[in-house]
Amino acid sequence: VMKQAGYVTGSVGKWHLGLGDGAVDWNETVYPGAKEVGYDYSFIQAATNDRVPCIFIENGKGVGLEPNDPLYVSYKHNFPGEPTGKDNPELLRMHPSVGHAGSIVNGVPRIGFQKGGKAAQWKDEDMAELFLEKANKDKPFFLYYGLHQPHVPRVPNQKFVGKSGMGPRGDVILEADWCVTEFLKELDKLGLTENTLVILTSDNGPVLDDGYQDQAVEMVGNHKMAGPHRGGKTSLYDGGTCIPFLLRWPAVVKPGVSDALVC
Protein backbone atom coordinates (compact mmCIF):
# COMPACT_ATOMS: atom_id res chain seq x y z
CA VAL A 1 0.00 0.00 0.00
CA MET A 2 2.76 2.46 0.94
CA LYS A 3 4.79 1.69 -2.19
CA GLN A 4 1.73 2.19 -4.36
CA ALA A 5 1.37 5.62 -2.79
CA GLY A 6 4.93 6.48 -3.81
CA TYR A 7 6.74 5.90 -0.53
CA VAL A 8 10.26 4.51 -0.22
CA THR A 9 9.94 1.77 2.40
CA GLY A 10 12.24 0.12 4.92
CA SER A 11 12.07 -2.43 7.73
CA VAL A 12 14.66 -2.60 10.50
CA GLY A 13 14.80 -4.65 13.71
CA LYS A 14 12.64 -7.44 15.09
CA TRP A 15 10.65 -9.22 12.39
CA HIS A 16 8.84 -12.38 13.57
CA LEU A 17 6.46 -12.39 10.61
CA GLY A 18 7.97 -15.44 8.98
CA LEU A 19 10.66 -15.85 6.33
CA GLY A 20 10.94 -18.37 3.55
CA ASP A 21 8.47 -21.01 2.49
CA GLY A 22 8.83 -24.25 4.44
CA ALA A 23 12.39 -25.53 4.84
CA VAL A 24 14.73 -22.52 4.68
CA ASP A 25 18.34 -22.62 3.50
CA TRP A 26 19.74 -19.68 5.43
CA ASN A 27 22.95 -19.75 3.38
CA GLU A 28 21.05 -18.69 0.25
CA THR A 29 18.71 -15.78 -0.44
CA VAL A 30 15.71 -16.22 1.86
CA TYR A 31 12.49 -15.95 -0.14
CA PRO A 32 9.79 -14.81 0.40
CA GLY A 33 10.70 -12.13 2.90
CA ALA A 34 10.41 -8.43 3.62
CA LYS A 35 10.84 -7.47 -0.05
CA GLU A 36 7.87 -9.57 -1.09
CA VAL A 37 5.55 -7.70 1.26
CA GLY A 38 6.66 -4.29 0.02
CA TYR A 39 9.92 -3.22 1.66
CA ASP A 40 12.60 -1.68 -0.55
CA TYR A 41 15.22 -2.24 2.15
CA SER A 42 15.33 -4.51 5.19
CA PHE A 43 17.80 -5.29 7.97
CA ILE A 44 16.01 -7.63 10.33
CA GLN A 45 16.29 -10.49 12.76
CA ALA A 46 15.42 -13.83 11.24
CA ALA A 47 12.77 -14.23 13.94
CA THR A 48 13.01 -12.76 17.47
CA ASN A 49 15.78 -12.17 20.00
CA ASP A 50 15.20 -15.51 21.72
CA ARG A 51 14.86 -17.76 18.65
CA VAL A 52 17.35 -19.27 16.25
CA PRO A 53 18.84 -18.47 13.85
CA CYS A 54 20.58 -15.66 15.72
CA ILE A 55 21.73 -13.76 12.65
CA PHE A 56 20.66 -10.64 10.79
CA ILE A 57 19.04 -10.77 7.36
CA GLU A 58 19.75 -7.85 5.02
CA ASN A 59 17.64 -7.75 1.88
CA GLY A 60 17.12 -11.50 2.09
CA LYS A 61 20.78 -12.41 2.69
CA GLY A 62 22.33 -13.65 5.93
CA VAL A 63 24.81 -10.99 7.10
CA GLY A 64 28.34 -12.29 7.68
CA LEU A 65 27.74 -15.92 6.71
CA GLU A 66 30.83 -17.63 5.33
CA PRO A 67 30.79 -20.47 2.74
CA ASN A 68 33.21 -22.59 4.80
CA ASP A 69 30.95 -22.43 7.87
CA PRO A 70 27.36 -22.84 6.68
CA LEU A 71 24.43 -22.32 9.04
CA TYR A 72 22.04 -25.13 9.89
CA VAL A 73 18.83 -24.68 11.88
CA SER A 74 16.32 -27.06 13.44
CA TYR A 75 13.38 -26.57 15.77
CA LYS A 76 13.07 -30.33 16.35
CA HIS A 77 16.47 -31.64 17.42
CA ASN A 78 19.95 -30.53 18.39
CA PHE A 79 23.03 -31.08 16.24
CA PRO A 80 25.63 -33.56 17.56
CA GLY A 81 28.23 -31.94 19.78
CA GLU A 82 26.50 -28.55 20.00
CA PRO A 83 26.03 -27.21 23.56
CA THR A 84 22.55 -26.32 24.80
CA GLY A 85 21.09 -24.46 27.72
CA LYS A 86 19.66 -27.71 29.07
CA ASP A 87 22.86 -29.75 28.92
CA ASN A 88 25.48 -27.05 29.50
CA PRO A 89 24.25 -24.55 32.12
CA GLU A 90 27.86 -23.80 33.03
CA LEU A 91 28.19 -21.90 29.73
CA LEU A 92 25.29 -19.54 30.45
CA ARG A 93 25.32 -15.95 31.64
CA MET A 94 21.50 -15.89 31.62
CA HIS A 95 19.47 -18.91 32.70
CA PRO A 96 16.03 -19.89 31.41
CA SER A 97 12.93 -20.18 33.57
CA VAL A 98 10.93 -22.01 30.91
CA GLY A 99 11.18 -22.89 27.23
CA HIS A 100 14.62 -21.50 26.40
CA ALA A 101 16.90 -24.53 26.60
CA GLY A 102 18.21 -24.78 23.04
CA SER A 103 21.38 -23.52 21.38
CA ILE A 104 23.59 -21.10 23.28
CA VAL A 105 24.43 -17.87 21.46
CA ASN A 106 26.32 -15.08 23.20
CA GLY A 107 25.98 -16.95 26.50
CA VAL A 108 22.18 -17.02 26.24
CA PRO A 109 20.07 -20.15 25.55
CA ARG A 110 17.53 -19.78 22.74
CA ILE A 111 14.46 -21.52 21.37
CA GLY A 112 15.55 -24.06 18.75
CA PHE A 113 18.93 -25.30 17.61
CA GLN A 114 21.57 -24.00 15.23
CA LYS A 115 25.01 -25.06 14.08
CA GLY A 116 27.67 -23.12 12.19
CA GLY A 117 27.48 -19.54 10.98
CA LYS A 118 29.70 -18.41 13.85
CA ALA A 119 30.92 -15.24 12.14
CA ALA A 120 27.33 -14.13 11.54
CA GLN A 121 26.03 -14.55 15.09
CA TRP A 122 24.79 -11.35 16.65
CA LYS A 123 25.85 -9.82 19.95
CA ASP A 124 22.74 -8.87 21.91
CA GLU A 125 24.32 -5.83 23.56
CA ASP A 126 25.11 -4.18 20.22
CA MET A 127 21.71 -4.53 18.52
CA ALA A 128 20.24 -1.15 19.42
CA GLU A 129 23.06 0.93 17.97
CA LEU A 130 23.30 -1.31 14.90
CA PHE A 131 19.58 -1.09 14.15
CA LEU A 132 19.62 2.69 14.55
CA GLU A 133 22.55 2.91 12.15
CA LYS A 134 20.68 0.87 9.56
CA ALA A 135 17.44 2.78 10.13
CA ASN A 136 19.20 6.02 9.29
CA LYS A 137 21.21 4.65 6.38
CA ASP A 138 18.76 5.25 3.56
CA LYS A 139 16.33 7.52 5.42
CA PRO A 140 13.20 5.83 4.03
CA PHE A 141 10.05 7.93 4.11
CA PHE A 142 8.14 4.98 5.56
CA LEU A 143 10.12 2.99 8.13
CA TYR A 144 8.94 0.08 10.23
CA TYR A 145 11.36 -0.06 13.16
CA GLY A 146 10.72 -3.16 15.28
CA LEU A 147 12.36 -2.44 18.63
CA HIS A 148 14.14 -5.53 19.96
CA GLN A 149 14.06 -4.18 23.52
CA PRO A 150 12.50 -5.02 25.93
CA HIS A 151 11.85 -8.43 24.31
CA VAL A 152 13.68 -11.33 25.95
CA PRO A 153 16.46 -12.13 26.41
CA ARG A 154 16.87 -8.82 28.19
CA VAL A 155 20.54 -8.10 27.60
CA PRO A 156 21.18 -4.34 27.84
CA ASN A 157 23.99 -2.45 26.20
CA GLN A 158 26.79 -1.83 28.69
CA LYS A 159 25.89 1.87 28.97
CA PHE A 160 22.52 0.89 30.50
CA VAL A 161 23.58 -1.96 32.79
CA GLY A 162 22.44 -1.22 36.35
CA LYS A 163 21.13 2.24 35.46
CA SER A 164 17.44 1.59 36.17
CA GLY A 165 17.74 -0.02 39.59
CA MET A 166 15.13 -2.51 38.33
CA GLY A 167 17.39 -5.23 36.93
CA PRO A 168 17.79 -6.21 33.27
CA ARG A 169 14.12 -5.56 32.43
CA GLY A 170 14.33 -2.00 33.70
CA ASP A 171 17.66 -1.47 31.97
CA VAL A 172 16.40 -2.57 28.56
CA ILE A 173 13.32 -0.37 28.93
CA LEU A 174 15.73 2.55 29.41
CA GLU A 175 17.57 1.38 26.31
CA ALA A 176 14.34 1.27 24.30
CA ASP A 177 13.59 4.81 25.43
CA TRP A 178 17.06 5.87 24.27
CA CYS A 179 16.47 4.23 20.87
CA VAL A 180 13.23 6.14 20.33
CA THR A 181 14.88 9.39 21.43
CA GLU A 182 17.80 8.91 19.03
CA PHE A 183 15.40 8.23 16.18
CA LEU A 184 13.46 11.42 16.92
CA LYS A 185 16.73 13.35 17.07
CA GLU A 186 17.56 12.10 13.58
CA LEU A 187 14.25 13.46 12.29
CA ASP A 188 15.08 16.80 13.90
CA LYS A 189 18.51 16.82 12.26
CA LEU A 190 16.97 16.12 8.86
CA GLY A 191 14.34 18.81 9.30
CA LEU A 192 11.53 16.26 8.97
CA THR A 193 9.97 16.48 12.42
CA GLU A 194 7.03 18.77 11.68
CA ASN A 195 5.59 16.74 8.83
CA THR A 196 6.51 13.20 9.86
CA LEU A 197 3.94 10.96 11.53
CA VAL A 198 5.57 8.79 14.20
CA ILE A 199 3.56 5.94 15.74
CA LEU A 200 4.78 4.06 18.80
CA THR A 201 2.81 0.95 19.68
CA SER A 202 3.18 -2.70 20.67
CA ASP A 203 1.95 -6.11 19.58
CA ASN A 204 0.86 -7.25 23.05
CA GLY A 205 0.59 -6.25 26.68
CA PRO A 206 3.50 -6.28 29.16
CA VAL A 207 5.16 -9.33 30.71
CA LEU A 208 7.56 -9.96 33.58
CA ASP A 209 8.81 -13.56 33.44
CA ASP A 210 8.99 -14.34 29.73
CA GLY A 211 11.21 -17.40 29.89
CA TYR A 212 14.43 -16.18 31.52
CA GLN A 213 15.57 -15.75 35.12
CA ASP A 214 16.29 -12.02 34.92
CA GLN A 215 14.85 -10.79 38.24
CA ALA A 216 11.90 -9.11 36.54
CA VAL A 217 9.36 -10.54 38.99
CA GLU A 218 11.52 -9.99 42.06
CA MET A 219 12.37 -6.36 41.29
CA VAL A 220 9.07 -5.00 39.97
CA GLY A 221 7.95 -3.98 43.47
CA ASN A 222 4.53 -2.31 43.62
CA HIS A 223 4.60 -1.25 39.98
CA LYS A 224 1.52 -2.35 38.04
CA MET A 225 2.87 -3.21 34.61
CA ALA A 226 -0.56 -3.11 32.93
CA GLY A 227 -1.90 -0.20 34.95
CA PRO A 228 -5.48 -0.84 36.08
CA HIS A 229 -5.93 -3.86 33.81
CA ARG A 230 -5.82 -7.54 34.69
CA GLY A 231 -3.43 -9.91 32.93
CA GLY A 232 -0.59 -9.30 30.49
CA LYS A 233 1.09 -10.83 27.44
CA THR A 234 -0.54 -14.12 26.31
CA SER A 235 -3.67 -13.25 28.32
CA LEU A 236 -7.13 -12.57 26.88
CA TYR A 237 -7.78 -10.04 29.63
CA ASP A 238 -7.40 -6.31 28.98
CA GLY A 239 -3.83 -6.35 30.28
CA GLY A 240 -2.85 -8.57 27.38
CA THR A 241 -4.80 -6.85 24.63
CA CYS A 242 -4.75 -3.15 25.58
CA ILE A 243 -1.56 -1.63 24.22
CA PRO A 244 -0.05 1.86 24.02
CA PHE A 245 -0.69 3.87 20.88
CA LEU A 246 1.28 7.11 20.78
CA LEU A 247 1.27 9.56 17.86
CA ARG A 248 3.57 12.47 17.10
CA TRP A 249 2.89 14.66 14.08
CA PRO A 250 3.50 18.26 15.13
CA ALA A 251 2.04 19.84 11.99
CA VAL A 252 -1.24 17.94 12.30
CA VAL A 253 -1.82 16.25 15.66
CA LYS A 254 -2.39 18.39 18.74
CA PRO A 255 -1.04 17.02 22.05
CA GLY A 256 -3.65 15.24 24.13
CA VAL A 257 -4.85 12.00 25.66
CA SER A 258 -7.70 9.79 24.52
CA ASP A 259 -9.21 6.65 26.03
CA ALA A 260 -11.07 5.81 22.83
CA LEU A 261 -10.87 2.20 21.67
CA VAL A 262 -8.80 1.84 18.50
CA CYS A 263 -9.23 -1.44 16.60
Predicted feature locations:
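Formylglycine-dependent sulfatase
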Residues: 1-263
